[in-house]
Amino acid sequence: MNNLIDTIKKIENILYSLERILKQECHNLLKSKTSNEEILELIKRKKILFKKLIILSQDRLCLEKEYNIFPPYESNNKLNNYWKKIINTCLILRKLNLKNKIIMNKKFYLNQRFLELSSSYKKSVTYNLDGNLEI
């Protein structure tokens, strides 16, 4: 049972780390001068944490089968409390992710509008897959 508790604690820690990264990403997106490298570094860190989270989730599922106990772990108060924290953190992550998505979409829209207005009205200016301008 201690293995399951340790695994759930690790999942909780990873989720808190993801929360900090998403808040930092939001802050960077709101700044007017943020380099792409800063955003890409945050994305790399998120990918690493998601890989760890997937592995821990698989371990958790195996341990649940072994101990024959499943979420929300009502028979075990300690596990139940950790699980509630995980659920709350996941809800916060969902809100932060949606907020970041909205900010990125607005920035992209404003950049696209500026590029269209700054060039002649007959030329279409867009970004290609490499992030370079195409006219």
UniProtKB/Swiss-Prot annotation:
InterPro entries per UniProt: FlgN-like (IPR007809), FlgN-like_sf (IPR036679)
Native species: Buchnera aphidicola subsp. Acyrthosiphon pisum (strain APS) (Acyrthosiphon pisum symbiotic bacterium)
GO BP: bacterial-type flagellum assembly
Lineage, top ranks: Bacteria, Pseudomonadati, Pseudomonadota, Gammaproteobacteria, Enterobacterales
GO CC entries: cytoplasm
Pfam families: FlgN (PF05130)
Keyword Transcription regulation: no
Origin superkingdom: Bacteria
Protein name: Putative flagella synthesis protein FlgN
Chief localization: cytoplasm
Its job: Required for the efficient initiation of filament assembly.
